[in-house]
């Protein structure tokens, strides 16, 4: 019988590049909580997905020579994309939402219109500082040393017509929500939100943009696209069927029991999100949990900074479950932690190979060696058994107390205390000595049974963290599915007295630290070398007189059009300063849209002989540079006049 519903979400990730270990950390943590709740008997809905609109993606797609939709399709659905990564990491999400999904687009348009009709969204004009990578507007007072307070990068002045959400209207209700003591965790985040955002005064929020087009159109004002706050945040509801016909379980699962988010987006989820839900008259989520960052060399990992760790490489080298375990054992969820390969390998060797792996392999091997794989039913109890039995029997209650409060690290510590005690129990009872005395047969069987029962309980509680390895361990100790339930994790003596074990593979082989670190460094160096730009060979020297024969001048693009029947050529009409328009054809159609080049300032060689291309005359050549197979036009500051000669 279900204990009720439990709806948990990750943030939806921004697919401007491949996802990294930081995204994996959040998703694995959310998956462990979801699996734990399923194990406990809850009806779980686990949602993840991708936030696919915005200026940054539009610009990255343009640089890649593809449409924004093609760009995000590759990052999300392509080889090594988000979906493939979550499949590799054994993520058990029930749904995956993309903000480009039709049902979400239609629902967001309806949501925007409802808030507009209520008067909580109004039209105005925005002027302020904007960070393109974060897609965030900031006031001067919020900047840190003149830079974005979230990512530390440069901001630029932006001014445009926009729609605004009356965030200021909801300042006091949001303050009360934050001070309730249950909505936002860890508690340190509450003080941060109130001190940094509520107390200085909430300003109304820009919720539409006109400076880019890659977004959900405001259907009653098509020049505007819905900005990320409305588009991305409402995914948690649209994915359940809110204002759309795709799903029909909004009433069953909403409100969310917990939104798991990185601490950098706590502000959006604990201030903006509840304010918008209040505007819509919708129930508020029960909790927002802001986890810490995985740091690399003391700094935050970032796709734009390029200092990221590839989870695929780690999973393939060490195993998915070993990586999942490390991420949730090494770092408390609410705090930052430094990622390192040394810590990962050490944790695998110490906890998984030495403690858990050793206990499993030794126990199974002794049952096979001393009893042919099946324990006899006779038993002989000893006081040495009492502490281990008591620890294992009470473990579930302690474990649940931590898991219910997102204490994944401490829950794992408690499990491994019992595993360590079981290894000590082997040394105390010395089964190899008992095996030499036939009269100790019942005592030996009791010792081995106690070890198998301890494994059954501890491995059951490790299921949310290392699902595949736990299933393999159950097969080795002869535990049937009905013996590895949540209820039975609190009961001692569930395995049959005559349990049969099965020899299996070594789940967590030890790793040679020195050798492995050397191989990782070699891989890193090879990857860096492969990514280094390949320079074209240097051409033979020319004299200054030969060079001076090239008449290179600044030109203004008056008109740019595609050439019929050609997928490579664009036809430029240029002002070269002579008073007569000049026509030049250039093979850059794959890399630029014609309309975006009009008005640009480019450089051309003018004194080349006319050349016929697709039946049209080309009088000169535009200068460009090649990088990663893409041609980039050489463009100058617009203040340089047409006809200016390069010197």
Identify the role of each PLM range:
Residues 2-71, 97-112, 117, 134, ...:
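N-terminal catalytic cores of NTP/NDP-binding nucleotidyl/phosphoryl-transfer enzymes
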Residues 298, 415, 451, 467-469, ...:
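Hydrophobic, well-ordered secondary-structure elements that form the walls
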Residues 528-647:
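Phosphate-backbone binding interfaces of nucleic-acid-interacting proteins
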Residues 118-171, 175:
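Cys/His-rich short segments
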Residues 71-130:
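A broadly conserved sequence feature marking short terminus-proximal activation segments
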Residues 123, 330, 335, 343-381, ...:
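Helix-rich, typically C-terminal accessory recognition domains appended to large enzymatic cores
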Residues 473-546:
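Intrinsic disorder at enzyme termini
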Residues 1-48, 103-107, 151, 157-369, ...:
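Structured secondary-structure scaffolds
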């Amino acid at each position: 019988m279900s204990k009720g519903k439990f709806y948990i979400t990750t943030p939806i990730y921004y697919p401007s590049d491949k996802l990294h270990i930081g995204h994996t950390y959040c998703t694995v943590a959310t998956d462990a909580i979801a699996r734990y709740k399923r194990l406990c008997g809850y009806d779980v809905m686990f949602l993840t997905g991708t936030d696919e609109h915005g200026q940054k993606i539009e610009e990255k797609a343009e640089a890649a020579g593809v449409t924004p939709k093609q760009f995000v399709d590759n990052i999300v659905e392509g080889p090594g994309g988000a979906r493939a990564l979550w499949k590799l990491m054994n993520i058990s999400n029930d749904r995956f939402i993309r903000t480009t999904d039709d049902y979400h687009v239609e629902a967001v348009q309806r949501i925007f219109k409802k808030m507009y009709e209520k008067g909580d969204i109004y039209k105005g004009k925005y002027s302020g500082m904007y960070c393109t990578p974060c897609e965030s507007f900031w006031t001067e007072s919020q900047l840190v040393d003149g830079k974005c307070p979230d990512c530390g990068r440069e901001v630029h002045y932006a001014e445009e017509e926009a729609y605004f959400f009356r965030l200021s209207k909801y300042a006091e209700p949001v303050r009360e929500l934050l001070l309730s003591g249950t909505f936002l965790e860890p508690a340190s985040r509450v003080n941060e939100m109130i001190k940094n955002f509520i107390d200085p005064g909430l300003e109304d929020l820009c919720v539409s943009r006109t400076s880019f087009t890659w977004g959900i159109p405001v259907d009653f004002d098509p020049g505007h696209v819905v900005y990320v706050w409305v588009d991305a945040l409402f995914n948690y509801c649209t994915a359940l069927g809110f204002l759309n016909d795709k799903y029909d379980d909004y009433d069953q699962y909403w409100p969310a029991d917990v939104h798991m988010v990185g601490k950098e987006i706590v502000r959006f989820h604990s201030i903006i999100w509840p304010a918008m839900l209040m505007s819509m008259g919708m129930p508020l989520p029960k909790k927002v949990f802001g986890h810490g960052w995985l740091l690399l060399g003391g700094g935050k990992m970032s796709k734009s900074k390029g200092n990221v760790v590839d989870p695929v490489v780690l999973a393939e080298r060490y195993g998915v479950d070993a990586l999942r375990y490390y991420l949730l054992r090494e770092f408390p969820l609410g705090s930052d932690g430094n990622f390192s390969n040394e810590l990962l390998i050490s944790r695998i060797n110490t906890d998984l190979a030495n403690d858990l792996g050793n206990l499993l392999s030794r126990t199974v091997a002794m049952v096979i060696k001393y009893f042919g794989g099946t324990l006899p039913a006779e038993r002989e109890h000893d006081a040495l058994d009492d502490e281990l039995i008591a620890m294992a029997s009470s473990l579930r209650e302690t474990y649940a107390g931590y898991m219910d409060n997102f204490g994944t690290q401490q829950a794992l510590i408690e499990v491994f205390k019992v595993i360590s005690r079981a290894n000590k129990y082997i040394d105390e009872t010395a089964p190899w000595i008992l095996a030499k005395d036939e009269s100790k047969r019942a005592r030996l069987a009791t010792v081995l049974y106690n070890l198998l029962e301890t494994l059954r309980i501890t491995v059951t509680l490790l299921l949310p963290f290392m699902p595949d390895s736990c299933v393999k361990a159950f097969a080795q100790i002869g535990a049937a599915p009905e013996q590895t339930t949540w209820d039975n994790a609190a009961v001692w003596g569930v395995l049959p007295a005559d349990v049969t074990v099965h020899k299996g593979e070594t789940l967590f082989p030890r790793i040679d630290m020195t050798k492995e670190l050397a191989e990782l460094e070699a891989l890193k160096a090879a990857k860096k070398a492969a990514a280094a730009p390949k320079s074209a060979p240097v051409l033979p020297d020319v004299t200054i007189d030969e060079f001076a024969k090239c008449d290179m001048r600044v030109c203004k693009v008056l008109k740019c059009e595609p050439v019929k029947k050609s997928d490579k050529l664009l036809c430029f009409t240029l002002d070269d300063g002579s008073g007569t328009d000049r026509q030049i054809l250039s093979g850059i159609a794959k890399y630029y849209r014609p309309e975006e080049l009009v008005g640009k300032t480019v450089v051309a060689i003018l004194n080349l002989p006319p050349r016929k291309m697709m039946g049209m005359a080309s009088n000169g050549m535009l200068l460009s540079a090649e990088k990663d197979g893409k041609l980039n036009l050489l463009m100058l500051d617009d203040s340089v006049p047409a006809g200016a000669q390069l010197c």
